[in-house]
Amino acid sequence: MVFSFRYLIISFLLVSSTIHSKDMEKLVFSEWNKPEINIFYRLPNKITENTKIIFVIHGNSRNADGYLNVWMKLANKHNVLLIAPEFNRSSFPSYNTLMMSTSSGRIRENKDLYLNNSIDLFFEHFNEKFGLEARNYMIYGHSGGSQFVHRYLLLSDNPKASKAVAANAGWYTFLHGAPYPYGIKNPPIELTSAHIRRFLNTEIHILIGSEDVKVDSSVNQSDGANAQGRNRFQRANNFFNVATDIVEENNLDFKWKYQIVNGAAHSNSKMSKAAAKILLKDLEEW
């Protein structure tokens, strides 16, 4: 009886420390047919039936913990579980295209590494791990993470994202006839009209910094990317306008928003502040 009682006390303490925390934590996710991946996360003060989930997708720097730290400060008073997967460079060099192609346009043949549906797999894992009742999630990505976000919402089977922010992407998959990854011609997986309709009818906020106009080695200069505009600012504007034209021509439902963040260049911290006003709106506070 003494052993059982001590065991129950220890178990309770372990559960309590897991469910009540404001510190960054990490797990190694291996429940798929791809290389294992580090996932950083931060639990709210207390998980309740109103706890929401926000995924934070890093840029090409791959510093998922740094991105999460920015959002921990922004969401410090909110009942939200923050999750930041780390797509390391060695295992997922082209995470920004969902591992479906290189940035120069060459299609990757190993479909086992494709990252469509990955976020929803993580979503289900965290829902089960912490006994959450979340039916959907929100997602933010900056730079390469912004590329990931919009392609993920386009090419995944049935993403449960209720709201998304794609900020300062270097280039896009336009909804026109250019070959994938620059357009939707000949994608490496099936892409139907239902995918496109759902994509356009998802609340996606395209954010671009007013000063994100610098062209350097970090900006994709391939022919396919340059056809989208000279810099990130032009490409974001053109991406949104092409989508708007398609919606008007085909009388489709459209929930996208376009926002210029004044004074911001290629800065995740500044774009995160703007995104937080969108994603944290109406969330429960402590």
Each language-model region and where it sits:
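Short glycine-enriched nucleophile-adjacent loop
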Residues: 146-157, 275
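N-terminal signal peptide c-region/cleavage motif recognized by signal peptidases
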Residues: 16-18
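Serine-hydrolase catalytic machinery in alpha/beta-hydrolase-like enzymes
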Residues: 27-43, 50-136
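The feature captures the conserved acid-bearing segment of alpha/beta-hydrolase catalytic domains
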Residues: 162-165, 169-248
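Gly/Ala-rich beta-loop-alpha elbow adjacent to hydrolase catalytic centers
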Residues: 139-141, 145
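Residue in the alpha/beta-hydrolase core beta-strand immediately N-terminal to the catalytic nucleophile
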Residues: 136-138, 163
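C-terminal catalytic histidine-bearing segment of alpha/beta-hydrolase fold enzymes
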Residues: 237-286
